[in-house]
From Swiss-Prot:
Compartments in which it is found: Periplasm
Lineage top rank: taxon: Bacteria
GO term, biological process aspect, one: lipoprotein transport
Keyword Protein transport listed: yes
Protein name (database record): Outer-membrane lipoprotein carrier protein
Family designation: Belongs to the LolA family.
Function: Participates in the translocation of lipoproteins from the inner membrane to the outer membrane. Only forms a complex with a lipoprotein if the residue after the N-terminal Cys is not an aspartate (The Asp acts as a targeting signal to indicate that the lipoprotein should stay in the inner membrane).
Key word Nuclease present: no
Entry keyword set: Chaperone, Periplasm, Protein transport, Signal, Transport
Annotated signal peptide: 1-22
Subunit structure: Monomer.
């Protein structure tokens, strides 16, 4: 279940940035400006290039501007992404392993960053095209592992996210039970490495 999760990290920027179609980009920015924080449940379905369902799952999603993100897949296999504002933690309980990336490193590798990363430089890396209540976000870089993201809104709420990868797989995430974050939810964006878990530290400062 980790592949769509890693693709989500690689999509962190597509949902937080864009450009080219100036009016469409501005409209998406306006939508996202109203989503400074939220918590929701999600269901996901992944289909391959032949439209065959290859994965399904459910979990909890939360975000807070700036640069905080929480994605907890609970069914059928648990996995977790936590962006604490500085680092991104990707935890696989089954493998007892956690990978750590610099936040900006993860953003540069991806597209859902538009949700939590609002700087102009990030938006300049993407093109945005609006179609009704949906926005198609495409990276300008040809080597991006996520080739496109589509986000759809309903009544000012983020309702659906769709990610397409280089292999043609489509991941669809439907959000439900959305609500603003409470004070107690601040702990969602804090990750403590469990005892006995291997750490794959990919942060640039760790590699120096």
């Amino acid at each position: 279940m980790l592949k769509p999760l890693s693709q989500l990290v690689c999509a962190l920027p597509l949902v937080v940035a864009a450009s080219s179609y100036a009016d469409d980009s501005a409209a998406l920015k306006d939508k996202l400006a109203k989503l400074d924080n939220l918590k929701a449940n999600f269901s996901q379905q992944v289909t391959d290039v032949n439209n065959k369902v290859i994965q399904q799952g459910t979990g909890t999603f939360a975000l807070a501007v700036p640069n905080q993100f929480y994605w907890h897949l609970t069914q059928p296999d648990e996995s977790l992404i936590v962006a604490d504002g500085r680092d991104v933690w990707i935890y696989n309980p089954f493998a007892e392993e956690v990978s750590v990336l610099d936040f900006n490193q993860a953003i540069n590798a991806s597209p859902i960053a538009l949700l939590v990363h609002r700087d102009d430089a990030t938006w300049q890396a993407y093109q945005v095209k609006r179609q009704d209540d949906c926005y198609q976000i495409t990276p300008k870089a040809v080597d991006a592992s996520v080739t496109g993201v589509e986000v759809c809104f309903k009544d000012e709420q983020l309702e659906v996210m769709k990610l397409t990868d280089q292999q043609g797989n489509l991941s669809v995430f439907n959000l439900s039970a959305q609500a603003p974050l409470k004070d107690a939810d601040a702990s969602l964006f804090q990750f403590t490495v469990p005892e006995g878990v291997d750490i794959d530290d990919q942060r640039l400062k760790a590699l120096d």
